[in-house]
Regions:
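Leu/Val/Ala/Ile-rich N-terminal alpha-helices, chiefly Sec-type signal peptides and the beginnings
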Residues: 1-132
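Short, charged low-complexity intrinsically disordered segments located at boundaries
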Residues: 78, 135-137, 237-241
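Long, non-membrane, amphipathic alpha-helices that form coiled-coils
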Residues: 99-107, 128, 135, 165, ...
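Residues on one face of amphipathic alpha-helical coiled coils
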Residues: 113-116, 120, 127, 134, ...
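Extended alpha-helical coiled-coil "stalk/arm" regions
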Residues: 131-157
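Long amphipathic all-alpha helical oligomerization modules
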Residues: 150-278
């Protein structure tokens, strides 16, 4: 059946033939078929993007580990961490680094996927533009034929054919509106993917290194404190200066981490559609 319809379409050349009902059925059908395929591709990308967001990384596990580590930093600053055993601190340090590396790997994979989607959207947007142009040409051709239809006495079959043509043109106008709408949606999805890529790049370049430094500073402070324990006044002053320097650095990085952490939250807001994109 498909080959038969394709043969008829090739025979008619996709053009209107006055009085031929098959030509009306096939008029603009190629552009509508292309539009339908593009729509399916956009839907597939959106569904896949949602699936990746839900399954590429264990968000709850990552967030829980980071929050636990940040709670430990707060506890350390208030001197509540001194009672913890060294092994427990080391385990927490290792767990935090493992979690950070897991997030880093997952975000890199997501970034590659988003870049691939961006290229796909470029092709889809171009194809939608072509569909819109083809549909516009069909509409113009049909409208011209309607304007030049015979006047005076006509048989019922002729009137019915032009009535079908008018309805067909109306359908093509709807398809053209859909092509325009899909193109806008594809542009928005492409832009949202670019925004998310930028946020991921910032997290990989700034946020994750800061979290690693936070963990290292805590362990370094522990090593320095134990290394200078029980020394003379000069040693005490050295450890005091080192302690003050590390605490200042820890406080500075902690505040910066909180600021940059907001950007991580924006990724989830964008993915969940909680933000509007220009």
């Amino acid at each position: 059946m498909k080959n038969e319809m394709q043969g008829i379409q090739e025979m008619l050349g996709g053009k209107l033939v006055t009085g031929d009902h098959d030509s009306i059925s096939l008029f603009g059908a190629a552009a509508q078929s292309d539009l339908n395929q593009i729509s399916r591709k956009i839907t597939d990308i959106v569904q896949k993007r949602f699936y990746n967001q839900e399954n590429m990384i264990d968000e709850e596990r990552v967030r829980a580990a980071i929050e636990q580590f940040e709670d430990s930093l707060r506890a350390y600053k208030s001197n509540r961490w001194r009672g913890f055993s060294q092994k427990k601190r080391q385990r927490e340090y290792d767990t935090t680094l493992d979690t950070i590396e897991l997030m880093s790997t997952s975000l890199k994979l997501r970034q590659v996927e988003l870049l691939r989607e961006t290229k796909i959207f470029e092709r889809l947007i171009a194809s939608l533009k072509v569909c819109e142009i083809n549909l516009t040409e069909c509409i113009s051709t049909g409208e011209m034929l309607l304007q030049n239809q015979p006047t005076g006495k006509r048989d019922a079959e002729d009137i019915f054919w032009y009535s079908r043509l008018e309805k067909r043109i109306s359908d093509l106008r709807i398809s053209r509106s859909l092509a325009q709408q899909f193109r806008v949606e594809a542009c928005l999805l492409q832009n949202s993917g670019i925004i998310i890529c930028d946020q991921i790049r910032n997290i990989l370049s700034n946020v994750l290194p800061i979290w690693r430094n936070q963990a290292s500073l805590v362990i370094q402070k522990e090593i320095v404190s134990k290394g200078f324990g029980g020394g003379n006044s000069t040693d005490y002053q050295n450890v005091h200066d080192a302690d003050e320097s590390l605490q200042y650095e820890l406080h500075r990085l902690y505040r910066l981490s909180e600021e940059l952490n907001d950007r991580r939250k924006r990724i989830n807001q964008i993915q969940n559609g909680k933000e509007e994109h220009p």
